[in-house]
Amino acid sequence: VSASSSAWSFPDRYDAEIKQAAERWLPGYDWRLWKAQLYQESLLNPDAVSPVGARGIAQFMPGTWLEVSRQLGYQNLSPHMAEPAIIAGAYYQGRQVRMWSAPRPDSDRYSLGAASYNAGAGNVLASQRVCGGANGYAEIIACLPRVTGDHATETKTYVQRIWRYWTEMLLGVK
């Protein structure tokens, strides 16, 4: 068996749904960026449950799932149902990205959106205020420990891994 044929790759089971959701709710971004975020969230596992209670492929906390479900008109759907959760997560991430509307690079906008998805938009906005209104992702994330303490490391790693997984997907590394 050659190394290339035995190499692990990112699961492609939900690629069509991820691509469709990203094109609708994250226009202008490569759909694999949303796939990388879902991979970071749950390893693309719709049955995933985090130690703090986040659920499904997009790792929704119960209150956020109820809010987003209501906004999308979902009734009696579970965050463990892959397709609706992929759509709802892309919708929610798109909302986080659009919140960071000041002129800045698209990569910073996505990173700030992902940090908001992970740590809560209020915490990332507070970090921006603590940093004197900083605009760039690197500057804002550097102040996050002053807002969330040790949890800031988790958020910084979360965003770094999304970009790493996306790069690996593009290069076919993993």
Located regions from the model:
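Non-catalytic cell-wall polysaccharide-engagement segments
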Residues: 1-17, 66-91, 95-174
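Generic alpha-helical structural context detector
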Residues: 35-39, 58-62, 115, 160, ...
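Peri-catalytic and regulatory segments of divalent metal-dependent proteins
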Residues: 13-25, 48-49
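Conserved alpha-helical segments that form or flank metal/cofactor-binding pockets of metalloenzymes
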Residues: 41-49
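Acidic/His-rich structured neighborhood in mature extracellular/periplasmic domains
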Residues: 42, 62, 84
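Extracytoplasmic
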Residues: 13, 29-34, 39, 52-55, ...
